[in-house]
Amino acid sequence: MNHLSEKVISLKGRDLLTLLDYTPEEVQQLLTQALELKQKAKNGEPTPYLTGKSLGMIFENASTRTRVSFEVGMTQLGGHALFLSPKDLQIGRGEPIKDTANVLSRYVDAIMIRTNSHESVEELAHYATVPVINALTDAYHPCQALADALTILEKKETLIGKKLAYIGDGNNVCHSLLAIGAKTGMDVTVATPKGYEVDQEIFQRATEAAKETGATLVQTTNPQVAAENADAIYTDVWASMGYEAEQSEREEVFQPYQVNDQLLTLAKKDVSFLHCLPAHRGEEVTASVIDGPHSAIYDQAENRLHAQKAVLTALLIGE
């Protein structure tokens, strides 16, 4: 079997619930492996590192990028991915998470889960005897943040000292961007309306982690302050899944936080625009920005594949 990096920190058997659980060295290793796997894919090199391995994918929420990228990633690595929706599982009929975790652990080599409740993922990981990967909860979206950091790294050549501005709702994506900024030395400024701030416990945990890398994490209600001299500007939908009923109310509150051409003029000339998708053109971002020359959204979406392949290989074979 071809090997990845020769000198690696073994992550075999670990869970990925939040990047705050990983050291800066471990996060950097995942990014390095993602770059290597991306290059191998570009070169047409086979990467059968997970031959004979199976990934159980539990989806309680709809998904395009997450399902396709994990499924294709496992296939490219020589393994198999099994899609499981609530209607396919007894957990959807009230079976305890403990039983589901223990039983699935007897069948598959890792479990990926996308659900609203972070507590449910923590419970699943507690009882599972195989690695559990958080593919989105109400608190974190670590695989997305790895892809985001990978994209910025490719565009800017380093993350250390670069400024990422996140503008919009202080949601799960925002939490994970704070986490990866803290772990990589990337400065992150978050601009949110009052009442829609990031979870302060998560912010404090990320701030504590940032002391190790020198990253600066800032909260503000002013999107112009966030955008000033930014290397990358990031936004997300104003109403995440589960908050659709608040759409009209949020549109009024978030309108001053729209990412548009005027806001981009405050950033560096080579600023990259990021969005985890799906996007609502004309709401959180204008079409001229998301479809313009600064947009890196499709590179970012592709990098979900490579980042997750790095996670899978690291957790399943330790390389």
Swiss-Prot record:
Any Pfam family = OTCace
Residues crossing the lipid bilayer are none
Does the keyword Cytoplasm feature in the UniProt annotation?
A: yes
Query: Might you give the EC number(s) for this enzyme?
Result: 2.1.3.3
Molecular-function annotations in GO: amino acid binding; ornithine carbamoyltransferase activity
Q: Which pathway is recorded for this entry? A: Amino-acid biosynthesis; L-arginine biosynthesis; L-arginine from L-ornithine and carbamoyl phosphate: step 1/3
* GO annotation terms (biological process): arginine biosynthetic process via ornithine; citrulline biosynthetic process; L-arginine biosynthetic process
Q: What is its main location?
A: cytoplasm
Q: Where does L-ornithine bind?
A: 172, 236, 240-241
Q: State its location(s).
A: Cytoplasm
Q: What is this protein called?
A: Ornithine carbamoyltransferase
